[in-house]
């Protein structure tokens, strides 16, 4: 135990008490038996333990609420994550507070401060600044300050953030996708959607290039088209692509929403999917199933992702050991939007 930073949870485990009991001793709360107090103080002295804000705050009464920040709940990716998290939270007697930031930094800062003022027991963030390659410095500082007072879990890599992280591993799902496309006879791939300052998008592009390289194939820069992560973005990008009179063989959409925009543009231009162009996507949300044709899509395993984030929070609050960084694998769901050539 001496090889790592000692936490209030380590003290609680060794003393055989709850983290809240340790916090009461640290704050000189009278509601602790003398026998427990002496035992805890001896362990604190043994490790020369210096409590931080999180250790002290555990002695306060729980609000049984968890705040969750997402960019836009209208995106089925984020709504699915929220619903799955809420289902787990309810099993442990917690309520969820949903905050939509609309991908706006000032809104993220405001929501984060408001959640702290409401004394929520933990905070989850998915998307937004947590996905940026260069997140806002002020926001990172605020996240780190918050993480010293309460459990903070982000559903991504979030550079610079000193909190718990659960991110999606892109390589496995992309490998399945490329193997499938190659088996269908496709070799020239276009990637549509996103921007190169967003970590999940960068990881997808890296994974795609790596997987193609294994088959001695390349992804030329002109085959990567940036656009917004929504239906309008996919529609505009596909219009641009079709107007270039260079009909693609297969398109990988960065998410299902972009794929829906691509479908809309193709329908207007009398381009048939998959007869003329194969189309595959990422996320495997309800959009994949209601699309015509139904979309082959890489599943982000959102249920597992959500459960890991919630279990991390419950473990921290309960004083159980948990990994600082966890990952979730992706897998391919094959439907009707890809043809054999």
Label every model-predicted segment.
Residues 44, 89, 211-212, 242, ...:
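Conserved hydrophobic residues forming the short capping helix/wall of the S-adenosyl-L-methionine
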Residues 47, 92, 146-150, 215, ...:
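Helix C-cap/helix->beta junction micro-motif
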Residues 1-63, 339:
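N-terminal helix-turn-helix DNA-binding module of bacterial transcription factors
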Residues 18, 64, 121, 186-188, ...:
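Short acidic/polar active-site loop segments enriched in Thr and Asp
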Residues 239-341:
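Flexible loop/turn connectors
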Residues 71-80, 99-107, 129-133, 165-176, ...:
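Hinge/beta->alpha junction and helix N-cap segments in small-molecule ligand-binding domains
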Residues 1-3, 7, 61-179, 183:
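Alpha-helical recognition/docking segments in bacterial nutrient-uptake
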